[in-house]
Curated annotation (Swiss-Prot):
GO terms for cellular component: cytoplasm. Residues 27-45 have a biased composition (Low complexity). Residues 1-236 are annotated as: Disordered. The gene is Cdv3. This is Protein CDV3 homolog. Residues 46-100 have a biased composition (Gly residues). Belongs to the CDV3 family. Pfam families: CDV3 (PF15359). It comes from Rattus norvegicus.
Length: 236
């Protein structure tokens, strides 16, 4: 009984191992074929793609199967990594390998862009000449008096005609005002006189002694009383 149980267990594990190995080999073959097709279509790493594709095709018969069963997966691994297609269709891998490497090198290399030098000196001079002409035209438009003198009086008047270019009438300068200064009379030396006394001439009258009995020169209270009485009489 024990032997039969051991055999049944061995058979069971052997079947399970076979199924696992078959699944692994089929997965590896599918992965190799898919990788070979994608590399051949994209053009990247064609050496690896050729080795993988050749390995997948040749592995369908016996190499891949035997390698998977016996555990010797070195041929597939080495063929896929090193791109050595000697065992299966090495011509395909050899023909596509160097061309693909050259293409990848050209793509990876930097191409220096050389900018063409253009001479803009003529354009700059032309632009400066145009700007100078425009400045001259603007100056001629702003100064109609110069055009009048240069054109003889006809062109300037035509250009400056219009209500927006009316020139103000030139006013005659006012006549200068002449200020006449009155000469001052000569002053006698040594004596100061005020301005009012300088113009009036006074005659000197002989002065006699004062009149003591005159009321005008020597007024008194009695004379004022007499004056009041005489006034009252006239009023009555």
């Amino acid at each position: 009984m024990a032997e039969t149980e051991e055999r049944s267990l061995d058979n069971f594990f052997a079947k399970r191992d076979k199924k696992k190995k078959k699944e692994r080999s089929s997965r590896a073959a599918n992965a190799a074929s898919g990788a070979g097709g994608s590399s051949a279509a994209a053009g990247s790493r064609p050496g690896d793609g050729g080795s993988l594709g050749s390995g997948a095709r040749s592995g369908d018969g016996g190499s891949s199967g035997s390698g998977a069963r016996s555990g010797d997966g070195g041929s597939l691994g080495s063929g896929a990594r090193s791109g050595d297609g000697g065992t299966s269709r090495s011509g395909d891998g050899g023909s596509a390998g160097p061309g693909g490497k050259a293409i990848t090198k050209d793509e990876n290399e930097w191409k220096e862009f050389e900018q063409k030098e253009v001479d803009y000196s003529g354009l700059r001079v032309q632009a400066m000449q145009i700007s100078e002409k425009e400045d001259d035209d603007n100056e001629k438009r702003e100064d109609p008096g110069d055009n009048w003198e240069e054109g003889g009086g006809g062109s300037g008047a035509e250009k400056s005609s219009g209500p927006w270019n009316k020139t103000a009438l030139v006013q005659a300068p006012p006549a200068p005002v002449t200020v006449t200064e009155t000469p001052e009379p000569a002053m006698p030396s040594g004596v100061y006189r005020p301005p009012g006394a300088r113009l009036t001439t006074t005659r000197k009258t002989p002065q006699g002694p004062p009149e003591i009995y005159s009321d005008t020169q020597f007024p008194s209270l009695q004379s004022t009383a007499k004056h009041v009485e005489s006034r009252n009489r006239y009023l009555k």
